[in-house]
Amino acid sequence: MQPVLSAEQREIMRCACRSERELAIMDLLYSSGGRVSEICQLNIADMDFINRRARIYGKGRKEREIYFSAQASLHIRDYLKTRTDDNPALLVGVKTPCRRLTIAGIQWILKNIQNRDERLRGLKISPHTFRRSCGTDMLNRGAPVEMVKEKLGHAKADTTLQCYAKISTEAVRDAERRFGAA
């Protein structure tokens, strides 16, 4: 089973962020559950901050919506206020001319954030770790598999269960208390 980040590890990473852009990237990756390729393709015009959703093009160029948290919305809007360029991309590099961030660029940013706190050293953290953490956390909180499947843009619920259902010991214990035969 691939690793997921605990709430504490995500908070440690958030505290290690040094810019609104870094916070926006982390919060958007986790709260939306979007693929890093989908996040990189986002334009500012795709964002609906009132309803906290964005239009993306997923695998197979299928259009769908992703939803993001109020926290992500706040950090994205604060990040956009710091920008002085006219690039339509949501996430851009800091060097002029500001170009759309790539998958490798986001990986590099996350690795730098991770390296700022020794408690995160040795963990395998990638953009996909945030997606996996989002799906796993939703399942652990009792979200129906079908809902998680839709959020993550999976074609089949089997994919969701196989890749994201790392159920915590506490969740198993709670389920046994609530639904067990005892």
Model-found features: residue ranges?
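Conserved catalytic core of the tyrosine transesterase superfamily
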Residues: 1-182
